[in-house]
């Protein structure tokens, strides 16, 4: 891949040895169908299992590795800073996000949006976690009115310029679409 990537997919990983190879394959398959130059960036957030070892030899892959666990947002930040694509896609390293949904995000971006957020429609979390998440999303949606169903879903697509306007910290990936909407970006 010598072309400048159009798409950069950034995935933070923490103790995902059982998922990482299958996830990489699904990402590459989804991106190859799009037919645009891409890069895949995995950020190992100080995993204590064999995640880092399982990443070795995967191609195409750019790997960023932390010596210790700094948290998901720090991993997203490192991956986004390493990304060179015009469109940056984020998703979790666990199987909650299906890379096959990436083309759906891009189709929405083709409608003129700057940020498109995914939705974990069939979440595999315990009932109470889903309940509190849905309640928080409902309250946030009533306050911000951004139309986002699942702000905690890490599957999102952003135009590169979005990250020139915002400093990443804490758990803010949940609130980035709302903050960017307040800055005038088109969010879906």
Describe every region a protein language model picked out.
Residues 6-8, 39:
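Cell-envelope/extracellular polymer assembly enzymes that use nucleotide-activated donors
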Residues 62-68, 72-82, 99-182:
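Acceptor/aglycone-binding surface of glycosyltransferases and processive sugar-polymer synthases
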Residues 16-31:
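Short, well-formed alpha-helical segments that are part of the catalytic scaffolds
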Residues 88:
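Short aromatic/hydrophobic "clamp" motif used to bind/position activated sugar donors
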Residues 16-19, 47, 98:
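Donor nucleotide-sugar binding loop of glycosyltransferases
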Residues 44-52, 95-96:
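A conserved acidic beta->alpha catalytic loop
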Residues 66, 91-93:
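Catalytic metal- and UDP-sugar-binding loop of GT-A-like glycosyltransferases, i.e.
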